[in-house]
Amino acid sequence: MERQFEIVSAYSPQGDQPVAIEKLVEGINSGKKKQVLLGATGTGKTFTISNVIKEVQKPTLVMAHNKTLAGQLYSELKDFFPNNAVEYFVSYYDYYQPEAYVPQTDTFIEKDAQINDEIDKLRHSATSALFERDDVIIVASVSCIYGLGSPEEYRELVVSLRVGMEKDRNQLLRELVDVQYGRNDIDFKRGTFRVRGDVVEIFPASLDEHCIRIEFFGDEIDRIREVNALTGEVLAERDHVAIFPASHFVTREEKMKVAIENIEKELEERLKELNDNGKLLEAQRIEQRTRYDLEMMREMGFCSGIENYSRHLTLRPAGATPYTLLDYFPKDFLIVMDESHVSVPQVRAMYNGDQARKQVLVDHGFRLPSALDNRPLTFDEFEEKTNQVIYVSATPGPYELEQSPEVIEQIIRPTGLLDPPIDIRPIEGQIDDLLGEIQDRIAKNERVLITTLTKKMSEDLTDYLKDVGIKVNYLHSEVKTLERIEIIRDLRLGKFDVLVGINLLREGLDIPEVSLVAILDADKEGFLRSERSLIQTIGRAARNENGRVIMYADRITRSMGIAIEETKRRRSIQEAYNEEHGITPKTIQKGVRDVIRATTAAEEPETYEATPAKKMTKKEREKTIAKMEAEMKEAAKALDFERAAELRDLLLELKAEG
């Protein structure tokens, strides 16, 4: 029986949500490939998207630009769809140091990773759900465009078991080993099985506490039961069960033999090429590493870093598009790109960064050239694989607007809250003026966000406010994701009243208690003060009925002008709607709860060693400057302004010393 998406919620669509839902559904049903939902902060974009999914009844991939945001969306969607399969698919690394080689110092960095077992389980749960049912929503980070094993292989290697089926017990054990399950009669955990006489217990890779107990009578399956793995309590009787592979990179034996032959052939060609070019060390290195991997694959059907051979294992030609999570979806599916102004540039950037690192490994004999095909999708490949897309953002980027010129707006908040009024005040005396405003807010038990241009200014301002007795905290780039969540929680609970930072646009900063957002040096045109950044920052004051924004500036820049006009336009639409429907704006009442503890991938941004510029050659300095400028622009594009500002300050120092 086909399951339908159904929303369980005490709310019904309000404000301009019904119109947005109707237009989006109409667009999808009429076959529109791309649509843009411009949803102002706090207008209930997730609820709108949930209603669209319910209306169109299509499996949906919701893409977020980081794990924390994906975690928040997963929690919200799980609340709206308790009877459907809402799954979570993000990188399963708690810590990830990719394999790399630094030729200048002849340093090889082994891949070092710590896999989060819980997230690995959720990833398996996500892929198996796509093969078992249609009512699936998968919330994913951009790791969903990285290579996965072939969905056909994954589907074909499912071990299907039914009551009454003729099956030799030992044959079942062999099949389980073929799909990467290990026999373990003592430490019974996910991805293992154990045998007790005529009873085989299997712990599927996608389950947490339940295992499947298969009871044989001779060569026939007599009974299938779902059992609590810890207590042995029988939870359910089953007529049929499908055991999905314990790894996404699984290959049938005959395919594995062909793959091993092809890898050996490639190795011989590569050795000849390296020896002909006099690269003897590289030749010895690649031969030693590859032969070891081949031996492991012959004996175990698996090796460490097997994903680097994925092109051979799936028998794809060189340069072919890799399989990703998108291939596990049926043809007719929907993609929702949340915060698309960040997600789209992020998808674009993935491929180039990955190739640059791998090319060095190939050149120096650490990997065969085919490893370059274990990669994320290019942007064009991603576009080809998408069916229908909804881009969701308060400030859609140029790409989204170009793809879908007709923007669907959602500006009215169900709470009646308005976009905040904006004051422009002179820079001279800004700190004293700001101090007075802060004290007014503290007296009313409200909170303040202050955004500055440089790290130094943030630190100085924080110190000054502390000295005059204000409870203040400073949010900077070194603060890890989970600490950020703690800081935001403490701000909401009133442990401090003011939060200072460079980049206040990251996730989780929509705080109802904030009634003032102060933007210092608002007239310094640049990536920190672009129209998109300003509109996003202004939105931080839109969850409180007393919300207000103060821009400290001596002139109105083009970006300021656009942001102010757009805010006024939205505010007038909201006021007219409130007047017509007799709505009085009310601050959002939102309980303070712990956000889902999503883990962070420890692929830290590059750090630049403090080599004095005087000791650098002219060429080295130019190279470092070019590299830092490129990284600064990338960081700015991704709205990671703290990192971009840090790099800008380093660049200024470097240029000055040069």
From Swiss-Prot:
PROSITE patterns: HELICASE_ATP_BIND_1 (PS51192), HELICASE_CTER (PS51194), UVR (PS50151). Residues 430-596 form the Helicase C-terminal domain. ATP binds at residues 39-46. The keyword tRNA processing does not apply. One of its GO terms (molecular function) is excinuclease ABC activity. The keyword Phosphoprotein does not apply. A motif (Beta-hairpin) lies at residues 92-115. Gene3D superfamilies: 6.10.140.240, P-loop containing nucleotide triphosphate hydrolases, UVR domain. Keywords: ATP-binding, Cytoplasm, DNA damage, DNA excision, DNA repair, Excision nuclease, Nucleotide-binding, SOS response. Residues 622-657 form the UVR domain. Residues 26-413 form the Helicase ATP-binding domain. GO terms for cellular component: cytoplasm; excinuclease repair complex. InterPro entries: Helicase/UvrB_N (IPR006935), Helicase_ATP-bd (IPR014001), Helicase_C-like (IPR001650), P-loop_NTPase (IPR027417), UVR_dom (IPR001943), UVR_dom_sf (IPR036876), UvrB (IPR004807), UvrB_inter (IPR041471). The beta-hairpin motif is involved in DNA binding. Forms a heterotetramer with UvrA during the search for lesions. Interacts with UvrC in an incision complex. Belongs to the UvrB family. The UvrABC repair system catalyzes the recognition and processing of DNA lesions. A damage recognition complex composed of 2 UvrA and 2 UvrB subunits scans DNA for abnormalities. Upon binding of the UvrA(2)B(2) complex to a putative damaged site, the DNA wraps around one UvrB monomer. DNA wrap is dependent on ATP binding by UvrB and probably causes local melting of the DNA helix, facilitating insertion of UvrB beta-hairpin between the DNA strands. Then UvrB probes one DNA strand for the presence of a lesion. This is UvrABC system protein B. It comes from Bacillus anthracis.
